[in-house]
Regions:
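An acidic/histidine-cluster motif and surrounding catalytic segment
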Residues: 1-71, 75-137
Length: 137
């Protein structure tokens, strides 16, 4: 199935006080050509930042109907392809992962993946993502 990512709502997670990050991610999404950009208020948990991040993703999943793409507010677009081909039975597609997750390919607890073709990866274990396309509930 071919998808034009620009036609899918771009949902970004952002803490209300992080105005600079908000401006940065909106600029990134505008430059990529997204037509519908939606902000979800991130959860601030200073003692448990990973829990706050996870809960923020959970909030986004419950506030917006699929299909949509979730972006974290610190992501950057590198080699952004506007049209992608994905399997028809996909429920979710990781569009980008952080450098922290990628540095441990097949060797650590962060991320394990297999390169299927031309940058399309099958993810086996993921703890760090910067954007995820959700196609179904």
């Amino acid at each position: 199935m071919n998808l034009d990512l620009r036609e899918i709502p771009a949902v970004y997670i952002n803490l209300q006080q992080d105005v600079e990050r908000k401006n940065s991610i909106v600029d990134v999404l505008d430059e990529c050509g997204f037509e519908n950009i939606i902000r979800v208020d991130g959860e601030y948990t200073p003692d448990r930042p990973l829990a706050g991040c996870s809960y923020s993703h959970y909030k986004a999943l419950n506030e917006v109907d699929p299909p949509f793409i979730i972006f974290e507010d610190d992501c950057k677009a590198k080699n952004f392809r506007t049209i992608i081909d994905i399997p028809d039975d996909s429920d979710a597609v990781y569009l980008g992962i952080s450098s922290w997750g990628r540095m441990n390919s097949h060797s650590g607890p962060c991320v394990q993946y297999e390169d299927l073709n031309g940058g399309l990866l099958r993810i086996y274990n993921m703890l760090s993502a910067h954007s995820v396309l959700y196609l179904d509930e």
